[in-house]
Swiss-Prot record:
Lineage start: Eukaryota, Fungi, Dikarya, Basidiomycota, Ustilaginomycotina
Protein name stated in the entry: Peptidyl-prolyl cis-trans isomerase D
Pfam families reported for this sequence: Pro_isomerase
Biological process per Gene Ontology, one example term: protein folding
Stretch forming the signal peptide: none
Gene Ontology molecular function terms on file: cyclosporin A binding; peptidyl-prolyl cis-trans isomerase activity
Function summary: PPIases accelerate the folding of proteins. It catalyzes the cis-trans isomerization of proline imidic peptide bonds in oligopeptides.
Protein species of origin: Mycosarcoma maydis (Corn smut fungus)
Gene name, Swiss-Prot/TrEMBL: CPR6
Length: 398
């Protein structure tokens, strides 16, 4: 079946996985949803195993845990390869269980891993299928004949890419949990009209969530990438002005993914385009930082990451030109970055780092009343904490 054909074969089950990325909320209903077609016409036993693990709400595994993907995590992520989940008993790749018992046999190994976004069974060798699965993010022909391909992604390729791009630690495990918070089967109009329970994005965004799925030419076209980034920033600004902070942050983050296609601009990039590209990226990072502090709940780690990127870029590059306008913008952007990172540290109750950043902000914007107020508030908190400690110590020796 063609990877570009989004119409499922009649009779094949359509299931979904709704994900949560750490504490980050979905920007709209269904925006973190992966919709999958199961190849019941080719591998009915394997497809039924996955379908039931998506829909079961009562049956228990032999461990006494729910026989379901719900509340399990993606425990293994390897960029440019695959994302793996389905271990709902141990969450580390050593557990899981099928609806037929602990393991079941390979049904058909002739399916090809020839395109991205295929759904395939993870195993520990021949005939060791359980509940663990993986979704490919590139063609993986070396897996042919070893793993059962039993489905494909119909919708939510950007969600798969987002999982693929998360920060990982030892054993390729995501640093923050990527959890399947809900799962089930879709039928009726949601399938026939291909909405799949996903609320429509009404921002006018027609771009793929990740640039690698948009156009191969972008990697060699700085101008086209810049204009997509600019368009996405404008969409985000509109949502920000409407206080739709979750959607705005989604668009700012997406714009940065596109701009990151060119972390170092080619030497032949026109000077005005190079300057505009850098300015746009800094502006989006600063906006994303502010936006992350306004979402519910706030996302201080996202704010810190974006502010740190701005600070690193501005302080590692050559000094601003002698033009007063350039110098003013340089110090203004640095002040914003330090102030917003300080605000994120305050949200994390890390006043020591917040104080250091606020002092840096004041160095770059000596007359900024907001920075001064926050420093005063921080000093009051510090004094109150010291008084509390003194009172506690005095009681110990009274």
């Amino acid at each position: 079946m063609s990877s570009t054909n989004t119409t499922p074969k009649p009779g094949n089950p359509i299931v979904y996985l709704d994900l949560a990325f750490g504490s980050s909320p979905a920007s709209r209903p269904g925006s973190n949803r992966i919709v999958l077609e199961l190849y019941a016409d080719r591998v009915p036993r394997t497809a039924e195993n996955f379908r039931v693990l998506c829909t079961n709400t009562s049956k228990l595994a032999s461990t006494g845990q729910p026989l379901s993907f719900r509340n399990s995590i993606f425990h293994r992520v390897i960029p440019k390869f695959m994302i793996q989940g389905g271990d709902f008993t141990r969450a580390d790749g050593t557990g899981g269980e099928s609806i037929y018992g602990e393991k079941f046999q390979d049904e058909d190994l002739t399916g090809k891993h020839d395109v991205p976004f295929l759904l395939s069974m993870a195993n520990a060798g021949a005939n060791t299928n359980g509940s663990q699965f993986f979704i490919t993010t590139v063609p993986t022909p070396h897996l042919d004949g070893k793993h059962v391909v039993f489905g494909r992604v119909l919708k939510g390729k950007g969600v798969v890419r987002r999982v693929e791009s998360v920060e990982t630690v030892a054993s390729d495990r995501p640093k923050e949990d990527v959890k399947i918070v809900d799962c089930g089967e879709l039928t009726g109009d949601e399938v026939s009209n291909q909405t799949y329970g996903i609320e429509q994005d009404d921002t006018g965004d027609q771009y793929e969530d990740f640039p690698e799925d948009q156009d191969d030419k972008l990697e060699s076209d700085v101008s086209a990438t810049y204009h997509i980034g600019l368009a996405l920033k404008n969409m985000a600004n509109t949502q920000f002005s409407k206080a739709n902070f979750d959607i705005a942050l989604e668009k700012y983050s997406k714009a940065l993914r596109y701009l990151q296609l060119h972390p170092i601009l080619p030497e032949d990039t026109p000077a005005d385009l190079a300057a505009n590209y850098t300015t746009l990226k800094t502006s989006i990072q600063l906006n994303a930082c502010l936006c992350a502090l306004k979402t519910t709940p706030a996302q201080p780690r996202v704010a810190i990451s974006n502010a740190t990127a701005v600070i690193s870029n501005l302080t590692s590059n050559k000094a601003p030109s002698t033009e007063q306008a350039d110098k003013n913008k340089y110090h203004s952007d640095l002040a914003k970055a330090f102030y917003r990172r300080a605000s994120a540290y305050v949200a994390q109750k890390d006043d020591e780092r917040a104080e250091a950043d606020l002092k840096h902000a004041l160095e770059n914007a000596p007359e900024d009343a907001g920075v001064k107020r926050e420093l005063q508030a921080l000093a009051r908190r510090k004094e109150a904490k010291l008084k509390g400690m003194r009172a506690a110590y005095s009681k110990m020796f009274s």
